Amino acid sequence: MANLKSTEKKTKAQAMGMHTEVLTGRTQQKFFNPDEAENFYYFGTYDVDFNKRTNLDVKDMTAAEANKKIDSLMSEGYGTIVIKNPQGKHSLGVGILNKLNLIFEGSLGYFGMGSCDGPIVRINGRVGWSCAENLMAGKVVIEKNAGSCFGAAIRGGDLICKGSVGARTGIDMKGGTIIIGGDAGAFTGFMMQRGRIIILGDVGINLGDSMYDGTIFIGGQIGSYGSDAVDSELTKSDQDWLKRKLKVAEIGENFDVSKMKKIVAGKKLWNYDNLEPTEKKGAI
């Protein structure tokens, strides 16, 4: 009985995707002193003033030139930068490891806002594939629609699309929250490991396929469930959290979260290599 309880503790996942995994001799948990919060900066980041605002027209710039200019403006202390005429350029706004208010007046191409940590971004248009890939922290809001692989491998922060998104949204995500106001395509949450996905509309086939952990909330119809994705009880705590999150995201006003479906990992794939051949067939 004691061994059973010990095993349960080692595999227990907290609610809403906050997973705690006990590993021999080490832990994935990190502890920081609040008094030292302002000491954690990346090399090459800048102190900026959010009240110091400027416009940047990138119509005749390449993506590399535009990104270098954004960095230069931050070095001058600008904390709010409005990008004019992005015109669907790929890889705009990537690699920003700084606190910053960034506003795009238009649409972005592929890989916009990838590998960022800290900025607050509003895109008044659409985005292509892999928007905000590897986001570490901050907030990215898309006013219209997004392409496939939206929020791939994000580790933190809030990623919000007020329209619909393509396939493989949240693929391999390891934390953070993705919120979709419309519909999502096939394989949403594929190989998801941590974090939460909220979709107010419908979702395509193979939802949560091969997900290891995390939580997916769906407000509409589900095309089909992927391997090891199962329904779970929507608790009062879940509903309260959803209401708060949607309110802060300024999306889904008056949406009835009590009717949402909650999908989690069935955990059959956790020890896949140790299963018998007949059990492996049932797991996938």
Located regions from the model:
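Glycine- and acidic-residue-rich phosphate-binding/metal-coordinating active-site segment common to enzymes
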Residues: 167, 173-183, 194
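Acidic, glycine-rich active-site loops and adjacent beta-strand->loop/helix elements
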Residues: 146, 165, 184
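Intrinsically disordered, low-complexity terminal regions
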Residues: 1-92, 193-200, 204-284
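Beta-strand repeat architectures
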Residues: 69-80, 91-100, 111-119, 130-136, ...
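Extracellular/lumenal glycan-associated surfaces
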Residues: 99-107, 119-120, 138, 157-158, ...
